UniProtKB/Swiss-Prot annotation:
Residue pairs linked by disulfide bridges in the UniProt entry: none
Annotated organism of origin: Liparis tunicatus
PANTHER family: HEMOGLOBIN FAMILY MEMBER, HEMOGLOBIN SUBUNIT ZETA
GO cellular component terms, semicolon-separated: blood microparticle; haptoglobin-hemoglobin complex; hemoglobin complex
Residue sites binding heme b per the record: 89
Family, per entry: Belongs to the globin family.
Name of this chain's protein: Hemoglobin subunit alpha-1
Binding-site residues for O2, renumbered to this chain: 60
Tissue: Red blood cells.
Length: 143
């Protein structure tokens, strides 16, 4: 699914609202992921606490949103812009790429809750397409 110029503008505009609370959004989304899709906990068994508000979840949520921030800056070429993250997730972390879509869904839910006025149907479509592109770019090295 390709992003139109309008989609890219919408993503960047919404990111302007998101960026101030990106760490908390990432933590909330990751916490949701671990509760709603408990099979994803397998990647984090080395953490002492997998509860939604644990320091480990908060820290990794921050890392996730740093990756999303990078993707926003590389929105015109997600594949090459996220190449290093794709390699890390494929070869080092060995994350099943299906989990990228699950996390994307959790992020969308958090955005809808936190930004009810800004998260219009048009913004929802643009962000969904953006996260599909991010998921595809992150899965690139799995092929």
């Amino acid at each position: 699914m390709s992003l139109s110029t309008k989609d890219k503008e919408t993503v960047k505009d919404l990111w302007g609202h998101i960026s101030a609370s990106a760490d908390a959004i990432g933590a909330d989304a990751l916490g949701r992921l671990l509760v709603v899709y408990p099979q994803t906990k397998i990647y984090f068994l080395h953490w002492p606490d997998l509860s939604p508000n644990s320091p480990s979840v908060k820290n990794h949520g921050k890392n996730i949103m740093s990756g999303i921030a990078l993707a926003v800056t590389k929105i015109d070429d997600l594949k090459s812009g996220l190449n290093a993250l794709s390699e890390q997730h494929a070869f080092q972390l060995r994350v099943d790429p299906a989990n990228f879509k699950l996390l994307s869904h959790c992020i969308l839910v958090v955005l809808a809750i936190r930004f009810p006025h800004e998260f219009t149907p048009e913004a929802h479509v643009a962000m969904d397409k953006f996260f599909c592109g991010v998921s595809l770019a992150l899965a690139e090295k799995y092929r």
